[in-house]
């Protein structure tokens, strides 16, 4: 099957509210229309995942940010220019069009542009942002090949786009841009050092928040939240 036909069929599944395993550079994602509450519900059901867990929206490029996010800071575009497409998810304020079911009840949403040309083409063709957690049953290892997805999820989803093995093999790095300084929420495929180099200062959350700046020498401890 030619790529154009495969892309069209995959996009149609997403538009119709179906579940589609899609390749990215990190791990395979379980994709659905992120604006369709029923489709999003099917993600949680297929994975056995709690519905209060936020999902990441995947888009083909940074120009889509203002469709789904409010008050997008200049920092987001700077990071996108430097690291997108790539394993970086940015937390931003969501617009009302993004359902709370997608964001786990939060007024913020994670946005990512995957570094996989076929998946970006599918999203572009579908014309909707794709909510896509890892394509595996909750509690099992993330899948890095289409065969792994087939073994775990077959019978629960409507299709698998085989894009070969994932290059990175770990989830995306997540940074919250709704706070100052930006805060690392999850380490992943993009190293923390790259974010510090781009932003100058990043807060890292653990039991006590550690603030790192670009000198790599200055560390200040902040009170942890309750």
Give, region by region, the residue ranges found by the protein language model.
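Active-site-adjacent structural elements in enzyme catalytic cores
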Residues: 1-211, 217-218, 224
